[in-house]
Every structure is written in structure tokens, then in C-alpha cells.
Amino acid sequence: MFNIHSVEIDWGGRPLKLETGKIARQADGAVVATYGETVVLATVVAAKSAKEGVDFLPLTVDYIEKTYAAGRIPGGYFKREGRPTEKETLVSRLIDRPIRPLFVDGWRNETQVIVTVLSHDMENDPDILALVASSAALTLSGAPFKGPIGAARVGFINDEYVLNPTLDEMVDTQLDLVVAGTADAVLMVESEAKELNEDIMLGAVMFGHRHFQPVVQAIIELAEKAAKEPREVAVVDESVLEKEILGLIEPELRAAYAIPVKQDRYAAVGKAKEKVMAHYFPEGQEPQYDKLRIAGVFKELEAKIVRWNILDTGKRIDGRDSKTVRNIVAQVGVLPRAHGSALFTRGETQALVVTTLGTGEDEQYIDSLSGTYKETFLLHYNFPPYSVGETGRMGGTKRREIGHGKLAWRAIHPVLPPHHEFPYTLRVVSEITESNGSSSMASVCGASLALMDAGVPLKRPTAGIAMGLILEGERFAVLSDILGDEDHLGDMDFKVAGTEQGITSLQMDIKIAGITEEIMKVALGQAKDGRIHILGEMSKALTNARAELGEYAPRIETFKIATDKIREVIGTGGKVIREIVEKTGAKVNIDDDGTVKVASSDGESIKAAIKWIKSIASDPELNAIYDGTVVKVMEFGAFVNFFGAKDGLVHISQLAAGRVQKTSDVVKEGDKVKVKLLGFDDRGKTRLSMKVVDQETGEDLEAKQKAAEGATAAE
């Protein structure tokens, strides 16, 4: 019934198995990949014919985590998986980025890659396995895929690279880097680092590339056993048409790509395109060509002209040389009621970034396969259509926005203060108000400034820069601070963020083979120069975190109570803590280890809440004097509330110095009195005294008398 083929290798000290022919046999390609006890199923289906009216590769990638993989049932009312989580979206993009450039030019058939996590062993993150399985399924599917690719995660622990560190090892690593590529070339890098230098980062990339070679060979071995015949894609030679169109509009197109202002440049390019379309599609005549074909050739010519100009003259679209960063204006405190804000403008790219400080109530609970955890740092990136002068639908967060937000998050996360030192929940929102390339890196710069404006003590200011590369044979040009057009028309774009000490985040996307380690080294060195320049420009606005929090930011005080007192502070059904919050106006969070966080924008509110909590969680001190309130009058004495929720008895004999006939002669309910804690009786009841305390001054009369007697005896 089954025609099963499999390959198994030892990879990083754990078995990696790739199997096909047993599950999902109606898909064009299906591979079950197992690493340790983590198992994923990757499937590929490609439509039989090209999609009409598209001039791009219609590829979709969906990575799906099933909770049964970790032996759990989903939360929520419906008890089933819902919309994609942030991690599912990020891993889907992680798979898409290295495989997309490897499809043969001209492939227009809808292609869908679905990766499902079937089992998670809590040691091996499924994302690397998902990349490997996707590559294998594509290689088997018959789709025109110029793979296979391999992938690996690289850690850096105790000054050594670690291949595919386990989830436990990731706690101690200074680096979390994912690298993917073919046997000959690196295609994609995604990373977060703790201020590591360029040599360590590049070394990690090459380490990962070397160590996923066995995976590439294993996929080739599996393909030799089970791959379908590759589908043919008709390759059309457009050289004659290119030459013809170039002769028609070359001067106009070259002139257009010398206009520095984006909107003016687009208008000039649009006129050149109209001229081409009018030439090939005259009114009233039968067209000789398909419109998409002519538009595609025109697009190719745009790329070639920009590339020729840069390589031949050293000048870019806006007149800069390859190393110059656009003009930068950085401002802080631009919004009066925000806790922290910054407006970062670099050329025609602008980000309005706002920081909000919250409390433990604002932490985000994240439900993942490896368990539920709380996230105290959130960074959200929004890219409205007006930022590029267009109209568009406003709706849910798009994949690109999630990806760019996470890239900026990775850049800032390593420089945040430890949560126990700065116990706030931080939310940073980057609103892209203008965009012409590098908006994610503008978000990094703006986030750093907005956090410091809010008084968050970052280790060091952080900046980001987007770089590009153009390669033609032996000639290449590395471009600093790329424009949007340079991003689309280049062979490599990579984004580097970090401090003056080192890199905190690196993302690379390489579209062609032939980019060597030496070229990458040059590019990273140039990126460092650009980053240091940007940090200098940012320092004109703010060099360090403000000494005080913003006027409207909450203040948080942290202290500890004994864990066996937590129940008393919370009370039955939360009654006590609710009363504290309602009457003081402060927010209170208590962790399982007894850490108490009290937050409010009003200092007196915090003091009142802390005093209340400590009165419950602490024990009263023997012989100490307390302010109290009479809560009940009895024949034998009065009960006084004197220490938080604690009551004690003032016996009738302890009410006043003389003989007291009736308790009500001295006190009544609601009276404010001063009492001294005498001790506890045999049943543990609290004994108090009023007569040994001066009810006006609160002075201890008993101690005063003893002191006087001692002085007399000394005489």
C-alpha cells in the first residue's frame, strides 16, 4: 500500500529522519521530518496551470502548530486552533524567504507549502525542522525549484558556536541565529545577539552554512529515490524586446532615475511607461504582445538602468555615493501626554515611535507549544497606506508588519534593563508616517529614543541601518541606507542593528549565488560605519535615558512578602486585594515567589497600598505603639483594629489608669485610640493596652516611668 522512502543522518548529536510515501500521498510533495522527538509534516501542492493575470510568483507558506503536538488542548471557548499566532506567522516568513528566490523565473503556478507540527519534544524548536522539511518536499514535488536548501540554528555559548542548541541551552546563549541556503550559497539569515562584533556574527553564518551541508546531501539522496520529474517552464528570450524598448525610452528612464524625490521620480517613470504602452498597444489596433509581458520587460529595464548607473558612475538614484547615509533629523518628547515619544526622519522615511509604561496587569500571556509565558516587552509596527502616498484597506495586522515589528523587537530586546531592576511592562508602537526604504530600521532608531525619553535605562542607544548589494561578475557595490527602489533592484539586502559595542540584530536576504564571505565581510564593515554615524545623529536629540519617568507614567515600587502570607493579602476570592486597590487607587500584582509590585502615578497612593499590604503580611512588634480604631465595645473591654486587618483586646483593666466601671465610659465604637502591644494570651489572642500610652502624644508612659525610676536609682 505504501511506497516509503527515507533517509536518516546524525546531525548535531541527534538523529534527523526524512520520510516520504506514507502520509499525504496526494500532495505533489510530502515529507515527514523527525529531529529527536519533534516531528513536522511538510506538504507542497502546485497548480497544474499558470495563474492568469499575474506577473509574480504566487507562493504561499503556512506553518501551523497543533497543540496536540505538546499533549495539550487549546484554550478558549471553541477548544481548537484559531488564527495564526505571531510565531506561526514569523516561521511562515522564515520558510518563504529562502525558498522564494529559488523558483525558476517565469513560474506563475499557484504553489502552496503547508508545514504542520505534529510532535514537540520540548528540546528541539520545530522551526528549523520546518525549513528542512519544506525544502525536501519542494525538491520531491516536481515544482521547478532550484534547491534543495538546508538550514541550521547557531548559538554562541562560552565563546563557542553551538549547532542547533536545545531550548534549555538557548537560555544561556549570546546569539540566536538562523541561517539557510544551498550547498554553495547562504540565502537567508535571521538573528538576535547580545552586542556581538561583526567577525563573530559572520563566523556564525559560515559555521551554520558548513554544518547544514549533511542535510542538503540527505535531501538529495531522498530525491534520487522519490522525486518527481521537474515541470518544464518555458523560458522566453526577451533580449530583442529589451533592446527595442530601451531604444524607445532610455534617455527618459535614465533621467527619471536621477530624480531624488520619490514621488517626482515615480511620475517620470510612469510617463516613460505610458510611452512604451502607447507604442505597443495603439488604440484601435490588435495588440501584438501581452500587456504583462511588456510591463515585465519594462520592469527589468528599470532594474538594469539603476544597476548600471551605480556600477558605472558610483552614483545612486538620489545622487549619493555608496556609503553616504541620508540626512537625519531626530526629535524626542513630541507628544505631550505619551510616556515617551520620538520622531525619527531619515530622508523620505519617517517613524513616529511611542513608548508606554505599564504594570504587571499589562503583560502579554503567550500560549506556545513549550508552555505559557509572560512577555513584558511589546513592539508593534504599523505601515498605513498613506506612508507611501497610496490608498489601501485598513484592517488586521499584516504578515509584513508582524515581521518588521519582530525585527525591531530583536534589535532592542538585548539592551533593555533586567525586569527585576525595571519592573515595567513596555509597549513600543512605531507608526510609519513616510516610507522610502528602511522603515524597520527607522523603527529601531525611534524605539531607542522613545524608550530613553520615557526614562527606560537602556544599556546603550541602539540604531539600525538597511544595506544593499549589487553584483555583476567581478564588480560589486555595497550600498548604505538603501532606498525602496534599491531594495527591490539589488541582489542582497540586509539590515543590521546594534550599539557602538556590537550587533543586536542581523537580517539578510540574498537573491543570487556568488556572494562570498569576503563580500559579506565588506558589507558588514560598511554597515558598522553607517550605524556609528546614525548613533551620532541620534545623540543630538538624547544621549541617555531621562533621570525621571514621564509625568504621566506610573511609578512602581517592588518589595517581597513571605509566600505563606500571599493568601492573606489576596483574601477569600480576592476580597482583600480588591479592597486595597479600590481604596488606595494603586495597582497591585503579587507573584508566586512573594514579589509585590505596587503601581500608581500618585506617590501617596503607592505609600498607602504598601503600608496596608505590609500590615497584613507582617507581624506586629511586641511593645510597639500603634494607632487603632475601636471596632467593638464589650463589658470586659474593647476590641481595637490596630495593624492592618488585625484586631486585639484592650481589657477593661487596661483602658485607663484609674478603675473603670463600664467600658463605654471610656470608649465607644469608631473612636481613634493609641495602643501598646503587650503580647498574646494562652489562646494566641492579642493583648493591648491604652492606659500605658499617652492618648494625646502617643508616648509610652510605662517606658517613661521605668526610665525615671532608673534615673532616680542612679542618683
From Swiss-Prot:
Tell me which GO cellular component terms the UniProt record holds.
Answer: cytosol
Q: What is its EC number?
A: 2.7.7.8
Renumbered to this chain, region (Disordered) spans 696-715
Return the InterPro entries for the record. ExoRNase_PH_dom1, ExoRNase_PH_dom2, ExoRNase_PH_dom2_sf, KH_dom, KH_dom_type_1, KH_dom_type_1_sf, NA-bd_OB-fold, PNPase
Output the Pfam families linked to this UniProt entry: KH_1, PNPase, RNase_PH, RNase_PH_C, S1
The S1 motif domain covers 623-691
* Catalytic activity, as annotated: RNA(n+1) + phosphate = RNA(n) + a ribonucleoside 5'-diphosphate
The record's subcellular locations are:
Cytoplasm
SMART domains of this UniProt entry? KH, S1
Q: Which Gene3D superfamilies match?
A: GHMP Kinase, N-terminal domain, K Homology domain, type 1, Nucleic acid-binding proteins
Boundaries of every KH domain copy: 554-613
| GO BP field | mRNA catabolic process; RNA processing
Predominant localisation class: cytoplasm
Q: Which GO terms describe its molecular function?
A: 3'-5'-RNA exonuclease activity; magnesium ion binding; polyribonucleotide nucleotidyltransferase activity; RNA binding
Q: What does this protein do?
A: Involved in mRNA degradation. Catalyzes the phosphorolysis of single-stranded polyribonucleotides processively in the 3'- to 5'-direction.
Family of the protein in this entry:
Belongs to the polyribonucleotide nucleotidyltransferase family.
Q: What is this protein called?
A: Polyribonucleotide nucleotidyltransferase
Record organism: Rhodopseudomonas palustris (strain BisB18)
